[in-house]
Regions:
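N-terminal low-complexity segments that are often proline-rich with Ser/Thr-Pro
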Residues: 275-277
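TRNA-recognition modules of translation machinery and tRNA-sensing kinases, especially anticodon-binding
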Residues: 1-273
Length: 277
């Protein structure tokens, strides 16, 4: 065994120019968020494990496979944060930030997250994340559009020309209708699904749409579309958001199969992809 210590698998040392570039990127994004009236927030690198199970979802890959759980001598189980949102919501509630007269809350953050997944090119067990949370008891369309604009302007400030992918997940009624349709569709095909998706069929069938197994992907292509199960109220709300984005000249595409592996996504989901770098 070598006497020379090396960095843990799936981590990296940021040296010199790379560290400077990282700091510059964070500074640029912080500046854009500040221009939109957002404030910084810092939260612990670890939280009670049950926070992530409740906030992120028991059936998600993050909770089932990817959390770094900490050995400790106390009565509580702790995990390194696999993402920021659950911890930020905990901080908002614990510190009663929801009682602020200045709503919606606009918060930005950056730092390490930790996911125990297979390291590969461009994927680490300790990636770094920058993000924003715009939070209110009742988020209106203009606030949601503004949050998307922060992302768009931030990427443009970094020299990236993004296009936004959007999907309307609807409200409770729409998702309940769609969940039943997915169960009806996938149940006869259960034996053809991977082991994980067989569990997802029982816990959260929407997560099957995010499966990366090629054989499951073929089944997903023929699955019912969520847009066919949206009630009129959800359709009108989404249409209003698209009007706001159009008025701001935001480039976007609609993706009926776009879902994400976190259970706290409601109503709308969006990701950005570069059209050029």
């Amino acid at each position: 065994m070598s006497n020379i210590f090396t960095k843990p698998r799936g981590t990296q040392d940021m040296l010199y120019d790379k560290a400077r570039s990282y700091n510059k990127i964070v500074d640029i994004l912080n500046s854009v968020a500040t221009n939109y009236g957002a404030s910084p927030i810092q939260i612990p690198m670890y939280e009670e494990s049950r926070l992530f199970k409740r906030g992120v979802g028991n059936s998600t890959d993050i909770v089932m496979k990817e959390t770094f759980d900490l050995a400790n001598k106390g009565d509580h189980d702790y995990s390194l944060r696999p993402e920021f949102t659950a911890g930020i919501m905990r901080a908002i509630i614990e510190n009663k930030l929801y009682a602020s007269p200045d709503l919606p809350l606009k918060l930005y953050y950056s730092g390490s997250i930790f996911r125990y997944e297979r390291p590969q090119q461009g994927r680490y067990r300790e990636p770094h994340q920058w993000g924003i949370e715009f939070t209110d008891l009742n988020l209106d369309d203009s606030t949601v559009a503004e949050a998307i604009l922060v992302m768009v302007d931030g990427l443009k400030a970094l020299g990236i020309d993004p296009i936004i992918k959007l999907n309307n997940l609807g409200g409770d009624i729409s998702r309940s209708n769609y969940r039943k349709a997915l169960v009806d569709y996938f149940t006869p095909l259960k034996d053809k699904l991977c082991t994980d998706c067989q569990k997802r069929l029982e816990l959260n069938p929407l997560r099957i749409l995010d499966c990366k197994v090629p054989e499951d992907h073929e089944l997903v292509l023929k699955a019912p579309l969520l847009k066919d199960y949206l009630i009129d109220e959800d359709k009108k709300k989404f249409a209003k958001l698209l009007e706001l984005l159009d008025s701001c000249n935001v480039k976007y595409t609609l993706d009926d199969k776009l879902v994400r592996g976190l259970d706290y996504y409601l109503s709308l989901i969006h990701i950005s992809e570069p059209t050029r770098l």
